[in-house]
Protein backbone atom coordinates (compact mmCIF):
# COMPACT_ATOMS: atom_id res chain seq x y z
CA UNK A 1 0.00 0.00 0.00
CA UNK A 2 1.19 3.50 -0.78
CA UNK A 3 1.17 5.96 2.10
CA UNK A 4 -0.39 9.30 1.28
CA UNK A 5 -4.03 10.30 1.17
CA UNK A 6 -3.75 11.90 -2.27
CA UNK A 7 -1.45 9.30 -3.79
CA UNK A 8 -2.87 7.42 -6.70
CA UNK A 9 -4.39 4.00 -5.97
CA UNK A 10 -2.17 1.03 -6.74
CA UNK A 11 -1.75 0.61 -10.48
CA UNK A 12 -2.67 4.18 -11.34
CA UNK A 13 -0.09 6.22 -13.21
CA UNK A 14 -0.86 9.71 -11.91
CA UNK A 15 -1.64 11.17 -8.48
CA UNK A 16 -5.14 12.46 -7.91
CA UNK A 17 -5.39 16.21 -8.59
CA UNK A 18 -8.17 18.56 -9.52
CA UNK A 19 -5.99 21.52 -10.40
CA UNK A 20 -4.71 22.42 -13.89
CA UNK A 21 -1.25 23.25 -12.58
CA UNK A 22 1.99 21.33 -12.44
CA UNK A 23 4.06 20.37 -9.43
CA UNK A 24 6.34 23.31 -10.16
CA UNK A 25 3.54 25.68 -9.17
CA UNK A 26 3.39 24.21 -5.68
CA UNK A 27 7.19 24.22 -5.50
CA UNK A 28 7.46 27.84 -6.56
CA UNK A 29 8.76 28.96 -3.18
CA UNK A 30 11.94 26.94 -3.63
CA UNK A 31 14.69 29.37 -4.50
CA UNK A 32 12.50 32.40 -3.79
CA UNK A 33 13.68 35.62 -2.20
CA UNK A 34 14.20 34.97 1.51
CA UNK A 35 14.22 37.47 4.36
CA UNK A 36 18.01 37.68 4.33
CA UNK A 37 18.02 37.98 0.54
CA UNK A 38 15.43 40.76 0.59
CA UNK A 39 17.44 42.81 3.11
CA UNK A 40 20.70 42.19 1.26
CA UNK A 41 19.12 43.48 -1.93
CA UNK A 42 17.77 46.59 -0.19
CA UNK A 43 21.21 47.30 1.27
CA UNK A 44 22.59 47.83 -2.25
CA UNK A 45 20.04 50.57 -3.01
CA UNK A 46 20.15 54.27 -2.15
CA UNK A 47 17.53 54.86 0.56
CA UNK A 48 17.07 58.57 -0.09
CA UNK A 49 16.60 57.99 -3.79
CA UNK A 50 14.14 55.17 -3.09
CA UNK A 51 12.07 57.40 -0.82
CA UNK A 52 11.95 60.12 -3.48
CA UNK A 53 11.23 57.78 -6.39
CA UNK A 54 8.73 55.52 -4.62
CA UNK A 55 6.61 57.68 -2.29
CA UNK A 56 3.49 55.53 -2.72
CA UNK A 57 5.41 52.34 -1.89
CA UNK A 58 7.01 53.86 1.21
CA UNK A 59 3.63 55.18 2.38
CA UNK A 60 2.08 51.75 1.79
CA UNK A 61 4.79 50.03 3.83
CA UNK A 62 4.19 52.46 6.69
CA UNK A 63 0.44 51.77 6.64
CA UNK A 64 1.07 48.03 6.59
CA UNK A 65 3.46 48.32 9.55
CA UNK A 66 0.83 50.19 11.56
CA UNK A 67 -1.90 47.72 10.59
CA UNK A 68 0.00 44.53 11.35
CA UNK A 69 1.08 45.86 14.75
CA UNK A 70 -2.54 45.64 15.89
CA UNK A 71 -3.56 42.52 13.96
CA UNK A 72 -4.78 39.40 15.76
CA UNK A 73 -5.13 35.91 14.34
CA UNK A 74 -8.85 35.72 15.07
CA UNK A 75 -9.61 39.23 13.76
CA UNK A 76 -10.84 40.09 10.24
CA UNK A 77 -8.03 40.53 7.73
CA UNK A 78 -7.03 43.92 6.28
CA UNK A 79 -6.59 44.56 2.54
CA UNK A 80 -4.24 46.95 0.75
CA UNK A 81 -4.63 47.66 -2.95
CA UNK A 82 -1.61 47.96 -5.24
CA UNK A 83 -3.25 49.71 -8.20
CA UNK A 84 -1.70 53.12 -7.46
CA UNK A 85 1.88 51.83 -7.58
CA UNK A 86 4.07 52.35 -10.64
CA UNK A 87 6.38 49.62 -11.91
CA UNK A 88 9.33 50.74 -9.78
CA UNK A 89 7.18 50.93 -6.67
CA UNK A 90 5.68 47.50 -7.34
CA UNK A 91 9.18 46.06 -7.67
CA UNK A 92 10.23 47.72 -4.43
CA UNK A 93 7.27 46.21 -2.56
CA UNK A 94 8.14 42.80 -4.00
CA UNK A 95 11.78 43.18 -2.91
CA UNK A 96 10.86 44.22 0.63
CA UNK A 97 8.24 41.52 1.16
CA UNK A 98 10.01 38.66 -0.64
CA UNK A 99 8.44 35.20 -0.55
CA UNK A 100 7.87 33.35 2.71
CA UNK A 101 7.10 29.80 3.74
CA UNK A 102 3.45 29.43 2.69
CA UNK A 103 2.13 29.53 -0.88
CA UNK A 104 -0.82 28.05 -2.71
CA UNK A 105 -3.77 28.36 -5.04
CA UNK A 106 -7.54 28.48 -4.75
CA UNK A 107 -9.64 27.13 -7.63
CA UNK A 108 -12.52 29.53 -8.27
CA UNK A 109 -15.97 28.62 -9.66
CA UNK A 110 -15.21 30.18 -13.07
CA UNK A 111 -12.26 27.85 -13.56
CA UNK A 112 -9.59 30.44 -12.79
CA UNK A 113 -7.12 30.41 -9.91
CA UNK A 114 -6.30 32.77 -7.08
CA UNK A 115 -2.56 32.62 -6.35
CA UNK A 116 -1.44 33.14 -2.76
CA UNK A 117 2.03 33.87 -1.43
CA UNK A 118 2.99 34.73 2.13
CA UNK A 119 5.80 37.27 2.43
CA UNK A 120 8.98 36.83 4.45
CA UNK A 121 7.07 38.83 7.06
CA UNK A 122 4.60 36.24 8.31
CA UNK A 123 0.99 37.35 8.23
CA UNK A 124 1.44 39.59 5.17
CA UNK A 125 0.07 37.87 2.06
CA UNK A 126 0.09 38.68 -1.63
CA UNK A 127 -3.02 37.56 -3.52
CA UNK A 128 -3.38 37.61 -7.30
CA UNK A 129 -6.53 36.70 -9.22
CA UNK A 130 -5.69 34.95 -12.48
CA UNK A 131 -8.66 36.48 -14.33
CA UNK A 132 -7.39 40.03 -13.90
CA UNK A 133 -3.68 40.83 -14.09
CA UNK A 134 -4.30 44.11 -12.25
CA UNK A 135 -6.37 42.53 -9.48
CA UNK A 136 -3.58 41.98 -7.01
CA UNK A 137 -3.53 43.04 -3.39
CA UNK A 138 -1.80 42.60 -0.07
CA UNK A 139 -3.68 41.17 2.87
CA UNK A 140 -2.83 41.08 6.56
CA UNK A 141 -4.35 38.20 8.48
CA UNK A 142 -3.93 34.64 9.66
CA UNK A 143 -4.70 33.44 6.12
CA UNK A 144 -6.24 35.25 3.12
CA UNK A 145 -10.01 35.59 3.32
CA UNK A 146 -10.39 33.92 -0.08
CA UNK A 147 -9.09 30.68 1.46
CA UNK A 148 -11.69 30.75 4.24
CA UNK A 149 -14.48 31.69 1.85
CA UNK A 150 -13.60 28.91 -0.60
CA UNK A 151 -13.39 26.38 2.24
CA UNK A 152 -16.90 27.36 3.35
CA UNK A 153 -18.67 28.15 0.07
CA UNK A 154 -17.09 25.78 -2.47
CA UNK A 155 -17.44 22.55 -0.49
CA UNK A 156 -20.33 20.30 0.51
CA UNK A 157 -21.68 20.23 4.05
CA UNK A 158 -22.49 16.51 3.94
CA UNK A 159 -21.80 13.42 1.86
CA UNK A 160 -23.28 10.01 1.25
CA UNK A 161 -21.39 6.79 1.86
CA UNK A 162 -22.01 4.49 -1.07
CA UNK A 163 -21.69 0.74 -1.44
CA UNK A 164 -18.33 -0.32 -0.06
CA UNK A 165 -16.29 -2.21 -2.68
CA UNK A 166 -14.98 -5.72 -2.26
CA UNK A 167 -11.62 -5.80 -0.52
CA UNK A 168 -12.33 -2.85 1.76
CA UNK A 169 -11.16 -3.22 5.36
CA UNK A 170 -11.63 -0.15 7.53
CA UNK A 171 -12.95 2.61 5.27
CA UNK A 172 -16.59 2.41 6.43
CA UNK A 173 -16.01 3.33 10.11
CA UNK A 174 -13.44 5.94 9.05
CA UNK A 175 -15.93 7.63 6.72
CA UNK A 176 -18.63 7.49 9.39
CA UNK A 177 -16.26 9.17 11.85
CA UNK A 178 -15.29 11.86 9.31
CA UNK A 179 -18.94 12.59 8.54
CA UNK A 180 -19.93 12.82 12.20
CA UNK A 181 -17.03 15.09 13.13
CA UNK A 182 -17.36 17.34 10.06
CA UNK A 183 -21.06 17.95 10.68
CA UNK A 184 -20.48 18.67 14.37
CA UNK A 185 -17.48 20.97 14.01
CA UNK A 186 -17.91 24.68 14.79
CA UNK A 187 -15.38 27.52 15.13
CA UNK A 188 -13.74 27.32 18.53
CA UNK A 189 -13.85 23.52 18.65
CA UNK A 190 -10.46 21.85 18.56
CA UNK A 191 -9.60 20.17 15.27
CA UNK A 192 -9.74 16.37 15.16
CA UNK A 193 -6.98 14.41 13.42
CA UNK A 194 -7.13 11.00 11.73
CA UNK A 195 -3.64 9.59 11.16
CA UNK A 196 -3.42 7.39 8.06
CA UNK A 197 0.27 6.73 8.61
CA UNK A 198 -0.61 4.38 11.48
CA UNK A 199 -4.12 3.34 10.44
CA UNK A 200 -4.42 -0.02 8.62
CA UNK A 201 -6.05 1.04 5.35
CA UNK A 202 -5.88 -1.03 2.17
CA UNK A 203 -5.47 0.50 -1.31
CA UNK A 204 -9.17 -0.24 -1.84
CA UNK A 205 -9.97 1.68 1.35
CA UNK A 206 -7.95 4.71 0.28
CA UNK A 207 -9.37 4.73 -3.23
CA UNK A 208 -12.95 4.59 -1.95
CA UNK A 209 -12.19 7.29 0.63
CA UNK A 210 -10.80 9.60 -2.06
CA UNK A 211 -13.78 8.98 -4.34
CA UNK A 212 -16.22 9.68 -1.50
CA UNK A 213 -14.89 12.94 -0.08
CA UNK A 214 -13.21 14.15 -3.29
CA UNK A 215 -10.71 16.94 -3.86
CA UNK A 216 -11.53 20.48 -2.81
CA UNK A 217 -10.66 23.95 -4.14
CA UNK A 218 -7.58 24.77 -2.03
CA UNK A 219 -3.93 23.70 -2.22
CA UNK A 220 -1.41 25.19 0.21
CA UNK A 221 2.24 24.32 0.80
CA UNK A 222 4.24 25.35 3.87
CA UNK A 223 8.02 25.10 3.73
CA UNK A 224 9.54 25.57 7.14
CA UNK A 225 11.39 22.66 8.71
CA UNK A 226 10.50 20.26 5.91
CA UNK A 227 7.44 20.53 3.72
CA UNK A 228 3.77 20.33 4.62
CA UNK A 229 1.03 20.13 2.01
CA UNK A 230 -2.49 21.17 2.97
CA UNK A 231 -5.37 20.29 0.64
CA UNK A 232 -9.03 20.96 1.18
CA UNK A 233 -11.34 18.07 0.39
CA UNK A 234 -14.75 18.39 -1.21
CA UNK A 235 -16.32 18.21 2.26
CA UNK A 236 -16.55 21.30 4.45
CA UNK A 237 -14.17 21.32 7.42
CA UNK A 238 -12.19 18.28 6.16
CA UNK A 239 -8.54 18.74 5.10
CA UNK A 240 -5.70 16.51 3.98
CA UNK A 241 -2.46 17.46 5.78
CA UNK A 242 0.73 15.70 4.69
CA UNK A 243 4.28 16.17 5.94
CA UNK A 244 7.30 15.32 3.76
CA UNK A 245 10.98 14.76 4.51
CA UNK A 246 13.92 16.13 2.53
CA UNK A 247 13.57 13.26 0.03
CA UNK A 248 9.96 14.35 -0.66
CA UNK A 249 8.62 11.17 0.96
CA UNK A 250 5.48 11.38 3.07
CA UNK A 251 6.32 10.85 6.74
CA UNK A 252 2.96 11.85 8.24
CA UNK A 253 -0.35 11.57 6.41
CA UNK A 254 -3.50 12.84 8.12
CA UNK A 255 -7.02 14.07 7.65
CA UNK A 256 -7.87 17.07 9.82
CA UNK A 257 -11.46 17.98 10.67
CA UNK A 258 -11.74 21.65 11.59
CA UNK A 259 -10.91 25.10 10.26
CA UNK A 260 -7.91 25.94 8.08
CA UNK A 261 -5.06 23.84 9.56
CA UNK A 262 -2.79 25.79 11.90
CA UNK A 263 0.33 24.88 9.93
CA UNK A 264 -0.83 27.33 7.24
CA UNK A 265 -1.90 30.12 9.62
CA UNK A 266 -0.05 33.14 10.96
CA UNK A 267 -0.29 33.46 14.75
CA UNK A 268 -0.40 36.50 17.03
CA UNK A 269 3.33 36.28 17.70
CA UNK A 270 3.96 36.29 13.93
CA UNK A 271 2.16 39.63 13.59
CA UNK A 272 4.15 41.11 16.47
CA UNK A 273 7.45 39.93 15.00
CA UNK A 274 6.58 41.08 11.47
CA UNK A 275 5.51 44.52 12.70
CA UNK A 276 8.81 44.97 14.50
CA UNK A 277 10.87 43.77 11.54
CA UNK A 278 8.98 45.93 9.03
CA UNK A 279 9.42 49.04 11.16
CA UNK A 280 13.14 48.29 11.39
CA UNK A 281 13.31 47.96 7.59
CA UNK A 282 11.52 51.28 7.10
CA UNK A 283 13.82 53.04 9.59
CA UNK A 284 16.95 51.54 8.07
CA UNK A 285 16.22 51.96 4.37
CA UNK A 286 13.57 54.64 3.88
CA UNK A 287 14.27 57.35 6.47
From Swiss-Prot:
The gene is hupH. It holds the Pfam family HupH_C. It comes from the Bacteria. Belongs to the HupH/HyaF family. InterPro entries: HupH_C_sf, HupH_Hydgase_express_prot_C. It comes from Bradyrhizobium diazoefficiens (strain JCM 10833 / BCRC 13528 / IAM 13628 / NBRC 14792 / USDA 110). This is Hydrogenase expression/formation protein HupH.
